[in-house]
Amino acid sequence: MENVVIIRYGEIMLKGNNKRFFEDKLVKQIRHALSDLGKLKVYKAHSRIYVDVDAYDVADITDRVKKVFGVVSLSVAKRFEVDMDRIKEVVLEEIKDRMLENPGIKTFKMESKRGDKRFPMQSLEISRELGGHVLENIENISVDVHHPDVSIHVEIRDQAFVFSNKISGFGGLPLGTNGKALLLLSGGIDSPVAGWMVGKRGVDIEAIHFHSYPFTSDRAKEKVMDLAKILSGYCGAFKLYSVNLLPIQKEINEKCPEEEMTILSRRFMMKIAERVALQNDCDALVTGESIGQVASQTVKSLNVTNSAVDLPVFRPLIAMDKVDIIDLSQKIETYETSILPFEDCCTVFLPKHPVTQPKLEKILQSESKLDVEALISAALEALEVEKISIED
């Protein structure tokens, strides 16, 4: 008998003629997530992916695999030759183990799947036979098919599988199946969630961060690095580009109306991000903006910001409430880092009354007072790049 992780995927099943491409990408991503653990056997069969895990830390493996985009759920199962008497023994062992872990278990349910049609019993018959065996051999337990304390699963294919746990994954599509995008990563709550959401749709990401050093601190930059490392646990290793926006902000502060500081700064960020994206084969920009959340995120403000670039701008949080964004940031474990009290470039020269309904003509008029190309070129010349990985 061997231990194996059974990995299930969902949306990939709907991909028709492209299904194999997505499956192969998912296998590749799972292998990559486990690559430093040794030569684990990861393989595809019966529209599932399997990882042989004997002699390995199973908890570590499941924790890594559940973060791989495309994985809907996984289970740690016992695998052995198909034999009904042996299946009965393993089912008893499984339910007894669960009862030792949780003495409060009083009800159970059997769920059986007969993938191998050569097996003489149908799925419902298998469940009845095994359920009866449990009732005959374990005291103080009963069947509850609607709200059981524990469900025991049996799958019969070329071999038999028995398990009682289902660990949820995040679903989505495997990384590397939908191009590459550049994430504008701040130190806040929203942008890491936006990057995660785009990654979940199979988009590889790189990231760019704007700071205002020395008006913003080294610790603020370290915070962004920490967020990027958490994100790399889901999205894989990526490049983080850092740009000092302070010289541009000083020029805006000196030559443009105070209330336009935020919107003009955002336009410069987008222009610089687009240059970096195009130089690195990115197909889109990604931001954490949500309608109406702050002054620069009204519909008119977003329209003025968009007009600064030609690349598509993905805003996966656009209609989400803040509480929903916070919930997701907690789920992906970026929240506690995001709320650390370190300033970012948006706090520098913050206007008392930022324009919320900007007119593009007026913003372009103010922008014409600046040497836009020279400011962008200087920022790009001072660009810093770091490779971000969860292992760092």
Swiss-Prot record:
Q: Note whether RNA-binding occurs among the keywords.
A: yes
Write down the chemical reaction(s) this protein catalyses.
Answer: [ThiI sulfur-carrier protein]-S-sulfanyl-L-cysteine + a uridine in tRNA + 2 reduced [2Fe-2S]-[ferredoxin] + ATP + H(+) = [ThiI sulfur-carrier protein]-L-cysteine + a 4-thiouridine in tRNA + 2 oxidized [2Fe-2S]-[ferredoxin] + AMP + diphosphate; [ThiS sulfur-carrier protein]-C-terminal Gly-Gly-AMP + S-sulfanyl-L-cysteinyl-[cysteine desulfurase] + AH2 = [ThiS sulfur-carrier protein]-C-terminal-Gly-aminoethanethioate + L-cysteinyl-[cysteine desulfurase] + A + AMP + 2 H(+)
InterPro entries, alphabetically?
Rossmann-like_a/b/a_fold, ThiI_AANH, ThiI_fer, ThiI_N, THUMP_dom, THUMP_ThiI, tRNA_STrfase, tRNA_sulfurtransferase_ThiI
Amino acids binding ATP: L184, L185, H209, F210, R266, G288, Q297
Gene3D superfamilies to which the protein is assigned, alphabetical: 3.30.2130.30, HUPs
Instruction: Identify the EC number(s).
Output: 2.8.1.4
Return one Gene Ontology term, BP aspect. thiamine diphosphate biosynthetic process
Q: Where is it predominantly found?
A: cytoplasm
For molecular function, the Gene Ontology terms on record are: ATP binding; CCA tRNA nucleotidyltransferase activity; tRNA binding; tRNA-uracil-4 sulfurtransferase activity
**What pathway is it annotated to?**
Cofactor biosynthesis; thiamine diphosphate biosynthesis
Give the top-level enzyme category.
Answer: transferase
Source domain of life: Bacteria
Q: Which GO terms describe its cellular component?
A: cytosol
Its keywords, alphabetically, are:
ATP-binding, Cytoplasm, Nucleotide-binding, RNA-binding, Thiamine biosynthesis, Transferase, tRNA-binding
Query: The THUMP domain covers which part of the protein?
Result: 59-167
Where is this protein localized, as stated in its record?
Answer: Cytoplasm
A Pfam family that the UniProt record links to this protein? ThiI_fer
Write out the similarity annotation: Belongs to the ThiI family.
What is the recorded function of this protein according to its Swiss-Prot or TrEMBL entry?
Catalyzes the ATP-dependent transfer of a sulfur to tRNA to produce 4-thiouridine in position 8 of tRNAs, which functions as a near-UV photosensor. Also catalyzes the transfer of sulfur to the sulfur carrier protein ThiS, forming ThiS-thiocarboxylate. This is a step in the synthesis of thiazole, in the thiamine biosynthesis pathway. The sulfur is donated as persulfide by IscS.
What protein am I looking at?
A: Probable tRNA sulfurtransferase
The species this protein belongs to is Alkaliphilus oremlandii (strain OhILAs) (Clostridium oremlandii (strain OhILAs))
Q: Which gene encodes it?
A: thiI
